[in-house]
Amino acid sequence: MGNSLPGAGKIAKNWREVLKPEEYAVLREGGTERAFTGEYWDTKTEGVYSCRACGTELFRSAEKFESHCGWPSFFAPLAEDRVRYLEDTTLGMRRVGVRCAACDSHLGHVFEGEGYDTPTDLRYCINSVCLTLEPQKS
């Protein structure tokens, strides 16, 4: 049974050829961009955010909220089958990593119970460099 996610057919054999060095460092090596430097951390543009590596639609602006953490924050993915979760114990912390379900690229982390006034009490803290934004058509 094959992967039925929209971006699954776009998996690159050599990510270094299709991604810029800063994109590769985060998407494929699990890095993190510096807070407050990414393209989308404070954008208010309405639309759909997709995986920069494979194009799978991951998040909508309707679920984006201001967390003031320096990275785009969402309270839910577009659909649960668009992301997968991975325990992350790097840096001496216990966190839950978020990856694109179609191409297995690292996106960021999800945090629970921080007290944000959102429907899920979750904060998907996603690196801007991992995303592209398709603005909503008027």
Regions found by a protein language model. Give the residues of each.
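Eukaryotic N-terminal low-complexity, Ser/Thr- and Lys/Arg-rich leader segments
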Residues: 1-3
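A short Gly-Trp-Pro
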Residues: 6-138
